[in-house]
């Protein structure tokens, strides 16, 4: 999320899918600098003989193009295959942050393939245990501390970039005597994978890229600089009910931003609204379009409820000496709407003109989000980048090896952009994951399991597996009902129209509560309780949800308990008291359905006041 102090910007820019980069100015093209990494070290590293995990270090040049350069140490973990090895996986989890702390997670993702695959993880230089860059007092929210950090590190900092780091990785591979690797890159790890492929094609047997960093025309990594209001339309277009809302999703949201700018609502500050449109959170994706329409029509509660969830949400700290390494990569590898050779004052002028001309955060302005273009919008303004160091040099001859690329609809870069960028690889295959977010193989739910299975299959036989992974497990809502009379009845045989409406309102209330337990949720997954939309309370337990006079439809109070299995099977035993019901009394309702499906309404079965019913799904 973007905040006035940029507290959450690093998490959003490095780890989430809420912004998309716009094309920066084209700069002078760079040629690929050839560096010779010794093909045979004087003697193998001691870890080469290990039969269990071996943590080691290797001395490498600070500047690989200068054999007389000072030496630094890079740290690595080498995990030999449990049985006979058929290959080696070189993995980087992204960031750019230390890699070694994520070794257990990488092992969990790869799991059975490590029986026959060695695993190599190298801490990129400048990070973690690899000659870390440190700047005491560094705060990414304070530009002066970034400038001071750059001055403190001096000219050495220019060599802590992906082009140099992949030479280190190659040196470690050779010191261990490992053959060509399958490079598993996640997030920023895909930038390292591309840099490695360009500089050491002989060392690459295959690559699996998850949540790919896209490079500019000059080969530098694009960082997010544009909002994604198009995603509001993507989720709405998949839903019959949402498509029935008045107007176009994108224009409706622009009207909402303008309304809140002109008439501020303390319960929905624009900073919070910017996060509510993050459709990679399933509850937001399910409700944001309907909530925006309701707000503009005079019903603010659905939108306010979404915004309240963000209060007190944890954010990633962005201060500390160790963030210097992050800055070195982000700025040295990155492409921004200013010239690499410009001084900070010129960069600020260029950045300001870019935002005035392109409005990349539209429908917001930087001021809407508490941001000052000249002070707090881009960390790298005060970081010199005198050395040419493209991640993927234009014209580099890339190896003709299998490359599998997975990309989600809601990731930082769209699947289409990723596919277009990676056409430079002769044998790359893009696999789109509908409604997928970032770091797909690390995710939960069926999509995470599916992508992990695809990764394991690809690493094993280097063929892109058949089958389809998807995270699309909901349909966006239509209009919020303001009375029982507005509720579309469930077509349950044996019940009159009034009772069908009560049944529909009861199910809508239960489904609203269950949606908070979608396996892809982040913010809502942390909730232990929440008020009902129109009153009452919902309490979340371990596999259970308790409704206490919870009202999703005004004056329809629902109490009882919902049981939800890990597989998404929901059963509910409820008591429903609805004003305007046929005889004005409470009804007992039993419900059973499959939650988290891409349907307008799943198939329902159960009893209403003791009478059995079944209703087919509505697709």
Report residues per predicted region.
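Alpha/beta-hydrolase fold active-site neighborhood
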Residues: 250-398, 464, 475-478, 482-601
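N-terminal cap/lid subdomain of alpha/beta-hydrolase-fold enzymes
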Residues: 70-146, 409, 420
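Secretory targeting and sorting signals
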Residues: 1-28
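Conserved alpha/beta-hydrolase "acid-adjacent" motif
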Residues: 412-417
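Conserved acidic catalytic loop of the alpha/beta-hydrolase fold
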Residues: 152-155, 163-180
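Catalytic active-site module of serine/aspartate enzymes centered on a nucleophile-bearing elbow/loop
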Residues: 434-499
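A catalytic-pocket lid/entrance helix-loop region that shapes and gates access to the active site
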Residues: 140, 193, 197-255, 289-319, ...
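Short beta-strand/loop motif that positions the catalytic acidic residue
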Residues: 399, 404-407
